[in-house]
Amino acid sequence: VNSRRSWVIFGIGVFAYLVAVMQRTSIGVAGVAATERFHVSAAVLSSMAVVQLIVYAAMQVPVGVLIDRVGSRALMIAGTALMVVGQVTVAFAPTIALAIVGRILVGAGDATVFTSLMRLVNSWFRGRIVPQLSQWIGNIGQLGQVLSAVPFALLLHESGWTTAFLSAASVSVVALVGIVAAIRDRPVGSSEGPRPATWRESIRQLRISLARPGTQLGFWSHFTTQSSGTVFSLMWGLPFMVFALGIDPAEASGLLIVSVVAGLIAGPILGLLTARFPLRRSNLVLAIVGMMGIVWALLLLWPGTPPLWLLILVLVAIGIGGPGSLIGFDFARTSNPLHSLGSANGIVNVGGFLASFVMMFLIGVALDAQNTAHTVAGLYALDSFRWAFAVQYVIVGLGVVFLVRARRRTRRRLAEEEGIEVGPLWVALVDVWRRRDGRGPGENVQ
């Protein structure tokens, strides 16, 4: 472990994930083109992305179980091949129905890559570098969004729908070759590989993973932090910027990169904080959620057209939410044995995408409900988006309630099993201040 071979596998795996993110987000920058190509309403258009995410989320637990049974390599090969077929289907789709079928295949293939890669990292690396590598997976992977926002969007604009989606499919072919050639499930001699088991035994292990409070805490952490950015980048961000704010489509696609850059900067910092203060990871999650809530409120309540700097602030906030969601997988890592980590990661990964497709669909419904004139201008009006985007507060607020409950149970189990008491953050900060001020021994902020 932690060898040169480990880094080769990490690099190829991250490239495969980057390509998967590009395939996932390609429909976001194609939203306007899809409206013109298929002549459909906002709700129908959103269903193309929603169905993709439903499939992605529904596949997470089965994929996690299969990773524990047959290994990451087989799942990554099958998933990447599915994405090739899916994007080719979208490229030639004459109707929205066939395009949705293609996106279903993309969602099914995409579902295998990230969870498989997280398991590979835990098999090939050890120590405090693991949570930092998890952040780098998310950060580098999000460069796939840059590929969809810039070269893919330009190709879509210049060469058309079919050429753009066929080109995207060809990149997955390259990733597939790399996976077949280099990815292996575990180091030679390791006993921590896939474990053949009956489905009854696999389901029993899944239930055990799901029952662990730390797994549930990871689920709700992912639920609350990832969804806003996914909804914006995958579906509603481009129509909002182009129609509601009057931004040029090419410039709007470029602005989506702001979120990626913010995530690239924040990810390593969050990785270091996660490794340094493992008992305060939930405080990081809640701080990120609070920050996103504040900047969204500023944007939605701004009188008139919001200024560009405020839009950029929102993009930065949701960009930080991306690496923030990866903290959920660190909860799974520290709460589950390696042989069942695939199942636990699958459960966690459902969270953000479950929130995303519910939020995405409800925003589409809210936009349609306000479009009494039945025009594109009315559909994507600024005031319509204000009310539609407010749906986020309901979904994320529900997630925060369950997150706090799961944290309470996780800390209770930590106290019972390991004798570690985690007090409120403000108490720990006061103790640290007293220690530095020489007034007392203080308590570790962890």
Which ranges hold each PLM region?
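Juxtamembrane intracellular "pre-TM" segments in multi-pass secondary transporters
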Residues: 1-2, 184-219, 421-438
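Cytoplasmic helix-loop-helix junction between adjacent transmembrane helices
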Residues: 102-141
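Helix-loop-helix hairpin linking two adjacent transmembrane segments in secondary transporters
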Residues: 136-187
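Cytoplasmic membrane-interface "Motif A"-like loop-to-helix N-cap segments
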Residues: 69-79, 275-290
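Helix-breaking motifs and short loop linkers at transmembrane-helix boundaries and internal kinks
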Residues: 39, 71, 92-98, 109, ...
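Conserved MFS/SLC helix-loop-helix module at the cytosolic interface between two early adjacent transmembrane helices
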Residues: 58-97
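Helix-to-loop junctions at the C-terminal end of transmembrane segments
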Residues: 59-71, 266-280
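Extracytoplasmic gate region of multi-pass secondary transporters
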Residues: 27-28, 213-268, 357-364
